[in-house]
């Protein structure tokens, strides 16, 4: 089980400053959102996806999160169509999570 949880611990550590500034009841939501963003990055870096983009195949990765409280999918605006926008899209998506008002 620890191997499965290692990735979420990495996300928690990488974004510790952002998460530490949130109230306890918002921290889990933000952690889930950041995890989705990080996993889109991981998928984008796989050989299969990289090769597809190099061949010019139309392939788009999307990052969405499911809300357990409301049953709605939330678009995290982590949409990647190639390596040329990967870092910029990542930074923008993380900034959006950081700036999202949490009621």
Q: Could you describe each region identified by the protein language model?
A:
Residues 1-103:
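Divalent-metal-activated hydrolytic enzyme cores
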């Amino acid at each position: 089980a620890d191997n499965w949880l290692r990735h979420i611990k990495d996300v928690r550590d990488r974004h510790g400053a952002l998460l530490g500034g949130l109230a306890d009841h918002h921290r889990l939501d933000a952690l889930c959102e950041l995890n989705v963003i990080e996993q889109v990055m991981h998928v984008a870096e796989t050989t299969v996806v990289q090769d597809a983009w190099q061949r010019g195949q139309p392939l788009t990765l999307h990052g969405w999160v499911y809300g357990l409280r409301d049953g709605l999918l939330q678009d995290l605006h982590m949409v990647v169509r190639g390596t040329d926008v990967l870092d910029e899209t990542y930074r923008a998506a993380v900034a959006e999570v950081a700036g999202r008002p949490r009621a």
